[in-house]
Amino acid sequence: MSNSLAVVRLDPGLPLPSRAHDGDAGVDLYSAEDVVLPPGQRALVRTGVAVAIPFGMVGLVHPRSGLASRVGLSIVNSPGTIDAGYRGELKVVLINLDPATPIVVNRGDRIAQLLVQRVELLELVEVSSFDEAGLAATSRGDGGHGSSGGHASL
Protein backbone atom coordinates (compact mmCIF):
# COMPACT_ATOMS: atom_id res chain seq x y z
CA MET A 1 0.00 0.00 0.00
CA SER A 2 1.33 3.43 -0.93
CA ASN A 3 2.31 6.05 1.63
CA SER A 4 0.87 8.86 -0.47
CA LEU A 5 -2.53 10.51 -0.78
CA ALA A 6 -3.71 11.91 -4.10
CA VAL A 7 -5.03 15.46 -3.60
CA VAL A 8 -6.79 17.60 -6.21
CA ARG A 9 -6.53 21.33 -5.56
CA LEU A 10 -9.96 22.63 -6.59
CA ASP A 11 -9.13 26.19 -5.50
CA PRO A 12 -5.69 27.31 -6.73
CA GLY A 13 -5.70 30.21 -4.25
CA LEU A 14 -5.49 27.90 -1.24
CA PRO A 15 -2.59 25.83 0.09
CA LEU A 16 -2.71 22.05 -0.05
CA PRO A 17 -3.48 20.30 3.24
CA SER A 18 -0.30 20.22 5.33
CA ARG A 19 1.12 19.13 8.67
CA ALA A 20 1.92 21.90 11.11
CA HIS A 21 4.81 19.89 12.61
CA ASP A 22 6.87 16.86 11.61
CA GLY A 23 5.23 13.73 12.95
CA ASP A 24 1.72 15.24 13.29
CA ALA A 25 -0.94 12.61 12.56
CA GLY A 26 -3.31 14.99 10.80
CA VAL A 27 -3.02 17.48 7.98
CA ASP A 28 -4.74 20.84 8.30
CA LEU A 29 -7.68 21.64 6.03
CA TYR A 30 -8.35 25.25 5.03
CA SER A 31 -11.58 27.17 4.55
CA ALA A 32 -12.32 28.04 0.92
CA GLU A 33 -14.81 30.74 1.93
CA ASP A 34 -15.61 33.46 4.43
CA VAL A 35 -18.24 32.38 6.96
CA VAL A 36 -19.82 34.06 9.98
CA LEU A 37 -21.21 31.57 12.50
CA PRO A 38 -23.64 33.08 15.02
CA PRO A 39 -23.76 31.41 18.46
CA GLY A 40 -25.16 27.89 18.24
CA GLN A 41 -25.27 27.90 14.44
CA ARG A 42 -23.57 25.58 11.96
CA ALA A 43 -22.40 25.84 8.36
CA LEU A 44 -21.16 23.47 5.67
CA VAL A 45 -17.76 24.91 4.72
CA ARG A 46 -15.85 24.07 1.54
CA THR A 47 -12.13 23.23 1.74
CA GLY A 48 -11.13 23.61 -1.90
CA VAL A 49 -9.63 20.11 -2.11
CA ALA A 50 -10.66 16.58 -3.02
CA VAL A 51 -8.75 13.45 -2.01
CA ALA A 52 -8.64 9.82 -3.12
CA ILE A 53 -8.59 7.77 0.07
CA PRO A 54 -7.04 4.38 -0.78
CA PHE A 55 -9.22 1.27 -0.52
CA GLY A 56 -8.88 -0.27 2.95
CA MET A 57 -8.44 3.15 4.54
CA VAL A 58 -10.73 5.88 5.84
CA GLY A 59 -10.36 9.64 6.15
CA LEU A 60 -11.44 11.11 9.49
CA VAL A 61 -12.04 14.86 9.81
CA HIS A 62 -11.43 16.09 13.36
CA PRO A 63 -11.76 19.53 14.97
CA ARG A 64 -8.62 21.53 15.62
CA SER A 65 -8.10 21.46 19.38
CA GLY A 66 -6.96 25.08 19.61
CA LEU A 67 -10.08 26.39 17.87
CA ALA A 68 -12.31 24.26 20.08
CA SER A 69 -10.66 25.41 23.31
CA ARG A 70 -10.12 29.09 22.41
CA VAL A 71 -13.33 30.05 20.58
CA GLY A 72 -15.68 27.05 20.73
CA LEU A 73 -15.44 26.12 17.04
CA SER A 74 -16.05 22.42 16.49
CA ILE A 75 -17.39 19.91 13.97
CA VAL A 76 -20.98 18.67 14.23
CA ASN A 77 -20.32 15.09 13.07
CA SER A 78 -16.93 14.66 14.65
CA PRO A 79 -15.14 12.86 13.33
CA GLY A 80 -16.47 13.23 9.82
CA THR A 81 -15.97 10.10 7.73
CA ILE A 82 -14.53 10.13 4.21
CA ASP A 83 -14.99 6.76 2.55
CA ALA A 84 -12.50 5.39 0.03
CA GLY A 85 -14.96 5.73 -2.86
CA TYR A 86 -15.71 9.46 -2.35
CA ARG A 87 -14.05 11.80 -4.85
CA GLY A 88 -15.85 15.11 -4.27
CA GLU A 89 -14.72 18.25 -2.50
CA LEU A 90 -14.12 17.84 1.22
CA LYS A 91 -16.60 19.90 3.22
CA VAL A 92 -16.70 20.39 6.97
CA VAL A 93 -19.83 20.97 9.08
CA LEU A 94 -18.58 23.59 11.53
CA ILE A 95 -20.55 24.67 14.61
CA ASN A 96 -20.14 27.62 16.95
CA LEU A 97 -20.50 26.27 20.49
CA ASP A 98 -19.96 29.67 22.11
CA PRO A 99 -23.24 30.83 23.71
CA ALA A 100 -22.74 34.54 23.00
CA THR A 101 -20.04 35.39 20.46
CA PRO A 102 -20.18 34.93 16.68
CA ILE A 103 -17.16 33.24 15.09
CA VAL A 104 -15.70 34.64 11.88
CA VAL A 105 -13.98 32.09 9.65
CA ASN A 106 -11.91 33.70 6.91
CA ARG A 107 -10.93 32.15 3.61
CA GLY A 108 -7.58 30.45 4.17
CA ASP A 109 -8.11 29.78 7.89
CA ARG A 110 -7.22 26.30 9.08
CA ILE A 111 -10.56 24.81 10.16
CA ALA A 112 -10.08 21.06 10.68
CA GLN A 113 -7.59 18.24 10.43
CA LEU A 114 -7.70 15.15 8.25
CA LEU A 115 -6.34 11.83 9.47
CA VAL A 116 -6.11 8.80 7.18
CA GLN A 117 -6.15 5.41 8.88
CA ARG A 118 -6.41 1.76 7.96
CA VAL A 119 -9.84 0.24 8.42
CA GLU A 120 -10.93 -3.38 8.72
CA LEU A 121 -13.64 -4.18 6.16
CA LEU A 122 -15.38 -6.96 8.02
CA GLU A 123 -18.06 -9.20 6.55
CA LEU A 124 -21.35 -8.84 8.44
CA VAL A 125 -22.80 -12.17 9.53
CA GLU A 126 -26.33 -12.33 10.92
CA VAL A 127 -26.73 -14.49 14.03
CA SER A 128 -29.88 -15.20 16.04
CA SER A 129 -28.09 -14.50 19.33
CA PHE A 130 -24.53 -14.12 20.56
CA ASP A 131 -24.92 -17.19 22.78
CA GLU A 132 -25.98 -19.38 19.85
CA ALA A 133 -23.11 -18.00 17.79
CA GLY A 134 -20.63 -19.16 20.44
CA LEU A 135 -19.64 -15.63 21.42
CA ALA A 136 -18.91 -15.65 25.13
CA ALA A 137 -20.69 -13.30 27.51
CA THR A 138 -18.66 -10.31 28.71
CA SER A 139 -18.55 -8.56 32.08
CA ARG A 140 -20.07 -5.48 30.44
CA GLY A 141 -22.92 -7.29 28.71
CA ASP A 142 -25.42 -4.77 27.35
CA GLY A 143 -24.44 -2.01 29.79
CA GLY A 144 -23.96 1.25 27.93
CA HIS A 145 -24.29 5.01 28.46
CA GLY A 146 -22.86 5.55 31.93
CA SER A 147 -22.78 1.91 32.98
CA SER A 148 -19.19 2.21 34.22
CA GLY A 149 -20.06 5.04 36.64
CA GLY A 150 -17.43 7.54 37.72
CA HIS A 151 -19.59 10.67 37.99
CA ALA A 152 -21.23 10.42 41.41
CA SER A 153 -21.99 14.16 41.52
CA LEU A 154 -23.93 14.17 38.24
Curated annotation (Swiss-Prot):
* Known EC number: 3.6.1.23
SUPFAM superfamilies with a match to the protein in the record? dUTPase-like
TM regions (residue ranges): none
What Pfam families does this protein's entry cite? dUTPase
Set out the biological process GO terms recorded for this chain's protein: dUMP biosynthetic process; dUTP catabolic process
Question: Is Magnesium there in the keyword field?
Answer: yes
Where substrate is bound, by residue? Answer: R64, S65, G66, N77, T81, I82, D83, K91
Question: What catalytic activity does the UniProt entry give for this protein?
Answer: dUTP + H2O = dUMP + diphosphate + H(+)
GO MF terms, alphabetically ordered: dUTP diphosphatase activity; magnesium ion binding
Q: What pathway, per the record?
A: Pyrimidine metabolism; dUMP biosynthesis; dUMP from dCTP (dUTP route): step 2/2
Q: Which cofactor does it need?
A: Mg(2+)
List the InterPro entries: dUTPase, dUTPase-like, dUTPase-like_sf, dUTPase_trimeric
The UniProt function text for this chain reads:
This enzyme is involved in nucleotide metabolism: it produces dUMP, the immediate precursor of thymidine nucleotides and it decreases the intracellular concentration of dUTP so that uracil cannot be incorporated into DNA.
Q: How does it assemble?
A: Homotrimer.
Family as reported in the entry's similarity comment: Belongs to the dUTPase family.
- Report further notes: Each trimer binds three substrate molecules. The ligands are bound between subunits, and for each substrate molecule, residues from adjacent subunits contribute to the binding interactions.
Protein name (Swiss-Prot/TrEMBL) = Deoxyuridine 5'-triphosphate nucleotidohydrolase
Organism of provenance = Mycobacterium ulcerans (strain Agy99)
